[in-house]
């Protein structure tokens, strides 16, 4: 089986990663505010719905909807698995934010890129240079120190705090699995096509469990959040 290979455009990848990190930094605060009036499932469904509409417009404009025509059964299974994993990531991360603090959730979710990096080594046989290994070791040490501090505080914490932390860690694990599957799918599909399929499936799967009428009743503060 052909495996995904790095494109070598590391500067673009670094820039996109930094932009993503900046968005992630503000996300838990906005989610915590919105969760005051919406449950985690409804909020996740709405996020997927908006993303589906945006991606549909983009692909229709760029003519990218035809990319799904030549996929074999294996690729469809990969797409379905990626969709389920990302649904799990969104839902469990929101549950974590709901039961713990935005700061704690944002720090714990950093386990996700570390697991993805390790997966790239073992699954895609990516070769790391010395500097990359040093960076990976620093991140791992920082996470270990943070986790040990959290475990000390957990003994004094509430059950809700522990449940929230566990939910965020699980969200990180399933996100790493999603990211690795997505990398393999990039051999046949563009990232926009992959995300459109995932967002569409997620919005349909979560619809029966959500309460769309609550979105329409949000006040100004929570609607902007």
Predicted feature locations:
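Transmembrane alpha-helical segments that form core, pore/gating elements
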Residues: 55, 116-118, 122, 153-213
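Glycine-/small-residue-enriched transmembrane alpha-helix faces in small-molecule transporters
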Residues: 2-45, 92, 155-184, 205
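Small-residue-rich packing faces within the transmembrane alpha-helices of Major Facilitator Superfamily
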Residues: 25-26, 49-53, 140, 200-204
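Hydrophobic transmembrane alpha-helices of multi-pass small-molecule transport proteins
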Residues: 55, 80, 118-119, 128-150, ...
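Membrane-interface helix termini and inter-helical loops of multi-pass transporters
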Residues: 29-40, 65-68, 98, 147-161, ...
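Cytoplasmic-side transmembrane-helix entry/capping segments in multi-pass membrane proteins
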Residues: 17-18, 73-80, 128-140, 188-197
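Specific transmembrane alpha-helical segments of multi-pass solute transporters/efflux pumps
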Residues: 23-28, 62-109, 145, 224
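Structural motif at transmembrane-helix junctions in multi-pass transporters
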Residues: 36-43, 91-111, 187-193
